[in-house]
């Protein structure tokens, strides 16, 4: 497994001899972007992200160790770039998406703080591993357990934990968890000036 991980890291860092592989996994036209654009378009009901990814892949070729696109695929590439831009404004940077992400990060951060203090929290085995262990990038590289638990994590682990945490005695954790479950999200306020200290205290 470590050999496969080393190979994947080499490709991702563009240290592997076949340079076009890096472009396939980390570039403006990488496979992940093609995949999530179609997937997110489907699940959000935003038609702008519905691109012809199969046609784009079919039009790709390798020239001098770099990915190239056949001339007849240019319009498909233009459509992909425009679709991605529209998806960012309509979905990824939408105020509800931003608020949800911020609340989830804050909820997990609070859970981690409590766990490291020794507070007992409900969590699946995979989620528990990350809550009760100080994890850094080095451990991801060196620890098979870390990678294995990360692979086991999915949405169900998080949502189940949030439901249980919504009744926890810690006010911060329970409030954030209930907000996520009941969709009572943070409000987004756009301003051109810096937030004053008084406004921060009010919030």
Residue ranges and their predicted role:
Residues 1-203:
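Histidine-centered, transition-metal-coordinating active-site segments
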